Amino acid sequence: MTNWKHFLDEEQDRFLSELIEFVKIPSVSASPDYIDDVKDAADWVAKRIIKAGGENVEVMQTGGHPCVYGDWLHAGSEKPTILIYGHFDVQPADPYDLWDTPPFDPVIRDEKVFGRGASDDKGGMLIPIISFEAIKETTGKLPVNVKFLFEGQEEIGSPELPDFIAKHRRKFSCDMIFSSDGLQWTEDEANLVTSLKGLVGAEIRVTGPTTDQHSGLHGGAIANPLMAISQLVASMKDEKGKITINGFYDDVLELTEEDRADIARVPYNEAEYIKELDVTELHGEEGYSTRERLCLLYTSDAADDTPCVDLGGRRII
């Protein structure tokens, strides 16, 4: 029987074609214009799990974008059950003029697939499906029981997922969850992430005049909402990067020496990191290394949710 490694090599062209086909589906979860496309992506995933040898495959409704479930539970009750998670929705692709090629017409360049979602997370979630297929196809079995759960709303914060999982907790019961949504440390070094930062979000709305007011006529007499929100956001951190939001640090655990030692053992090239981000310098709270700030330190950031601004001569408050 063919070795699973040989199987992967022999089927490489097929897997690549499948990824390109998958990326062509514009499954943007943030826009109602793409609801049907997200459903199409869910159907594609369900068919791919079946093709790989998965069983009990179904597209499940959540009240929002759907989830896809599948399993293979023949390793035996004494063997652990691993649930593999991923997502098939993608971020919006605009601004389109910054793309060298159409985001949903993927191309291969420099041995990489360029297209929206190729890495986050369509390529990532295909890997465990392909691995499952390779082992099952070449050995006829797996050493563990496997469940798949792929969702279509991760990029908007998975709003329906908690209640959905609670409702179907027996179906999703497992001994371990493996997330396919992540990054490899470097091209030559793999990594196993054991925890992730949590997230708390708040929306800030600043209102001003109900109609456009000319800055030349009314500037200096009324408050400018853009200036106000800029001042508000800037006040969230001091010049040393420390967060100034009242109560932010309450009950926050400090990094231990063991935490710092664990992070320090991980290979890291700061010059390469700066080059990769195309910035001139790094910034953050004093007293911590870049890796400590990235991996374990609490942060506060502002995410822009304002509409595009036409700067063609308009002077509006």
PLM features: what roles do these ranges have?
Residues 193-207:
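Flexible glycine/proline-rich, aromatic-decorated loop/lid segments
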Residues 244-295:
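Long, low-complexity segments enriched in small/aliphatic residues
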Residues 298-305:
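Conserved small/polar residues in nucleotide/adenosyl-binding loops
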Residues 309-317:
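Hydrophobic alpha-helical segments, chiefly the membrane-spanning helices
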Residues 2-96:
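N-terminal helical capping/dimerization or prosegment-like subdomains
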Residues 219-240:
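A short core secondary-structure module
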Residues 79-150:
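Active-site metal-coordination/substrate-binding segment of hydrolases
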Residues 119-195:
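Acidic/histidine-rich catalytic neighborhood of metal-dependent amide-processing enzymes
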